[in-house]
Amino acid sequence: MSYPWPLDASELFGERYPQMINTGLPVGDVDTVRAAVSDMWADAPGGWVHEWSKLAAAYADAGAHDRAALAYGWAKFPTLADASKRVALARQLEQYQLAAPDFGLRFRRQVLELPYRGGTTDVPVHLLAPFDLPAGRPVLIASGGVDSWKMDVHGLLVLLATQLRLQVLAFDIAGTGESTVPMTGAGGAELVGGLIAHARSLGNGVVGHVGISMGGYFSARSGLAGDVDAAVVLGGPVEAAFTGARKDVFGMDGIVGNALGFDAPPTDEELALRRAEFSLRPLLDEDRNAPMLIVNGADDVHVPQHDTLVFQGRRDTVVDLVPGTGHCAVSKLPEVFPTILGWLDRTLNTAVEAAR
């Protein structure tokens, strides 16, 4: 259920550099790896996995387990297309757990057995909460996207837990990270439904959903369906991104193809057919949504502006298309995230009051 494909490492660095340096790695170290990498798939000097893993191992040897986890996260990026990427993910998890005592939060890892297509599947989750978590607080479920997973967005999860003083349940969407099932719209949504039900049992019953990138597809889906009490969609595709009219860039065809479960590069027709079932048009045509906050950068090369602006005019929905930034507004997150935190705080508190 994986395959490598032609991918220019220098182009990936060009696109993801802001994300690399804004999530906790020193600029100089990122620049050193960037200068050393000449091939995406070679597990040898000059190869993406090799050079990022070399940096990660140096951090680990120095006891900087948080940075080691981040660097191994980039080593396995953008998908688990071969054995060396899978090794990097295992090492990322190891370093992440070693870093946990210094998170400044209560951390717990669990593997949930959730309903899936007539059977069950295991879903590893990470629970983060303040040490002095008040009783009777809401719970947030949160995920990254198709190539940046729960451990890769740790910094944002910490902000959510500490600033909102609640428990965050972090997971990988279907087809990514530690998930063992392919990404589909219905199947992935079924797993999210199981996570929502579990989250309602952990706090006061009020649950919010924060989704980043492709994770935003699933938070849009749960928000539009009214399955949660608040939904944040950060850079999520919902409709136009799934049409054949757009061209994939920066290797996104292979990233998505791997997540969908192909074991060899699909044809354009095969990829388009799988993508078509993700459209949220049926839910967009209904009026039963929970309160929603939709945010993205106006210059996103992966998700058309339509997929943000289509939410304008909806009941209980705030839309923010941020100028001068791209996918998930990543270069302006220090400006955008306080808005997200403020909206969540108000919306979840309103839901708590309404439930009393």
Residue ranges and their predicted role:
Residues 287-288, 293-296:
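Short beta-strand/loop motif that positions the catalytic acidic residue
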Residues 161-178:
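Conserved alpha/beta-hydrolase
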Residues 146-158, 306:
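The serine-hydrolase catalytic nucleophile loop
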Residues 182-202:
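Alpha/beta-hydrolase active-site loop
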Residues 221-273, 290:
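Hydrolase active-site cap/lid region
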Residues 301-307:
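Conserved alpha/beta-hydrolase "acid-adjacent" motif
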Residues 79, 325-337:
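Catalytic histidine-centered segment of alpha/beta-hydrolase-like enzymes
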Residues 88-132:
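N-terminal cap/lid segment of alpha/beta-hydrolase-fold proteins
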